[in-house]
C-alpha cells in the first residue's frame, strides 16, 4: 500500500487524467482492504488459483466497496472505484466483468496500479515487467496509465537478466499451439442452436483468443535465430510467455465460471474449449 499510494497519485497527475489526485492516492492505500476477509491460503500463493480459490478471491473488491460504503463517509466515487480495481477495459477482469465506460476512470486507474504493484516483488526489472504486462494485450488498460509505467521503467534504467534463453519449442511455442487448438475448437462449436449463454461463451472464447493472437503476433522477433536476439529480446520473450500463459489460464477459468449456469449437456459440449486452454505453470 505504501508504494501504491504515490503511484496512484502520479497516474492521476499524468496527462491530465480526469481523476482527483487525493482520491487516487486514498484508493491506492485502501484498494486491497477487502483481502482482510479472504482466507490466507488464497493470498500470495506461488501457484495460480484454481476455480474454487478464484471464487474466494474475486469477491474481495466488492467486500471492500461495501465495507467502505457502510463504515466511512468516503465519496461513492472512491468506493465504487475500489470495487473495480481488478476490472479490465476489455471485460476480462473481475468481479463484474465490466468493460469500457462501465468502469469509472478512478477504477481503471486503480486497476493499472494493482497490476503494476503485483509485479513489484519481482527480483529483476519489476517496472519493465509491469510496463510489458500493461501493454502486451491490446485493450486491457488505457494508454494514459500504461504510458506512465512505461516512462517510469525507461527512466529507471533497469538491468534486465542476461542469462535468459528461450528454446524454440518453449513457452511461446506452447502459447501458439494452444491458441490454434482453442480457436479451432471454438469455431467448430459455433452454432445457432443452444442457449444464449452457450453462444456467449463460445463468442467470448473466440474474441479473447483473437486478442491474444494479436498480442502474440506483435512480439516482432519471429524468424530470428537465438544468436540475433539481444538480452532485451530474450527477456521480452520470457515475459510474453508468462503473461500470455496467464491470460490463457484466466480465459479458461472465466469460461468455466460462466458455464456453471449451463445445462450439463451444454457444459459437456463446451468442455473441449477449456480443455484446449489448459496451460502449464512453472
Could you tell me what each predicted segment is?
Residues 1-77, 97, 101, 161-166, ...:
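Acidic/His-rich, divalent-metal-binding segments that scaffold phosphate/diphosphate chemistry
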Residues 14, 119-122:
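Short alpha-helical segment immediately N-terminal to, or the first helix within
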Residues 28, 68-111, 124-246, 264, ...:
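Histidine/acidic-rich helix-loop-helix segments that form or flank divalent-metal centers
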Residues 35-36, 95, 118, 146:
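General alpha-helical segment detector with a strong preference for membrane-spanning helices
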Residues 38-39, 91, 121:
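Active-site-flanking alpha-helical
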Residues 52-53, 63-64, 114, 118, ...:
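Phosphate/pyrophosphate-binding active-site loops
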